[in-house]
């Protein structure tokens, strides 16, 4: 309530109730914060920051110290705030969290290295690589694939061929045709997805 008055919130009781309920703290509203766990204090800080309905919000490690259930609640809450059209700056070392929540990700190492969507960062750092799951893969297939003009890289891992293409959407059918004509049983095709952590490590490595 003190912070609500500092922010000159008109409906103090209504706003306090709204955000305490949304963050699962309403039943503890009469308790002193000294009895709160670290996670509860974290949620209380978020509720306090939202009392005056800011359109721009800075959150520093909002799920730090929270158990999995509370972390999920906070992430869902942040997603709801985003759907309401609020701009949120999220500072986090949890790259999986950043990948789930953020439209754009900035990577810093003494300076801003890059700022883009997670998907664009993956593409710019690693390109788009397609995984062809085969009944049986052989090293000789790689040599043949590398002769194709639209194949940038190719390697075999067990019974999988991992291929980097100029344009997967266009080239995938051509690869399938090539493999089928060679008598290869193609069982499944999927795109290799790198984690945001792998992207981050590669970016800071070459910075």
Residue ranges and their predicted role:
Residues 1-28:
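Conserved ABC ATPase "signature" region
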Residues 32-36:
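Conserved ABC ATPase signature
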Residues 46:
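Hydrophobic anchor residue at the start of the ABC signature
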Residues 53:
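Conserved catalytic motifs of ABC-family nucleotide-binding domains
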Residues 57-60:
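Catalytic Walker B motif of ABC-type/P-loop ATPase nucleotide-binding domains
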Residues 68-70:
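Helix N-cap at the start of a conserved alpha-helix in ABC-type nucleotide-binding domains
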Residues 75-166:
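ABC transporter nucleotide-binding domain
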């Amino acid at each position: 309530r003190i912070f609500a008055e500092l922010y000159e919130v008109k409906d103090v009781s209504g706003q306090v109730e709204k955000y305490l309920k949304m963050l699962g703290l309403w039943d503890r509203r009469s308790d002193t914060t000294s009895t709160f766990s670290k996670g509860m204090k974290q949620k209380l800080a978020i509720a306090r920051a939202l009392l005056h309905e800011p359109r721009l919000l800075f959150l520093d490690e909002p799920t730090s110290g929270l158990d999995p259930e509370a972390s999920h609640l906070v992430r869902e809450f942040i997603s709801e705030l985003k759907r309401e059209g609020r701009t949120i700056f999220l500072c986090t070392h949890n790259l999986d969290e950043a990948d789930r929540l953020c439209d754009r990700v900035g990577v810093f190492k003494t300076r801003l290295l890059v700022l883009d969507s997670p998907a664009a960062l993956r593409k710019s750092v690693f390109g788009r690589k397609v995984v062809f799951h085969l009944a049986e893969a052989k090293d000789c297939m790689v040599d043949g694939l590398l002769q194709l003009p639209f194949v940038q890289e190719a390697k075999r891992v067990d019974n999988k061929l991992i291929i980097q293409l100029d344009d997967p959407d266009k080239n995938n059918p051509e690869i399938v045709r090539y493999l089928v004509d060679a008598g290869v049983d193609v069982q499944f095709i999927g795109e290799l997805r790198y984690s945001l952590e792998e992207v981050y490590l590669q970016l800071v490595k070459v910075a």
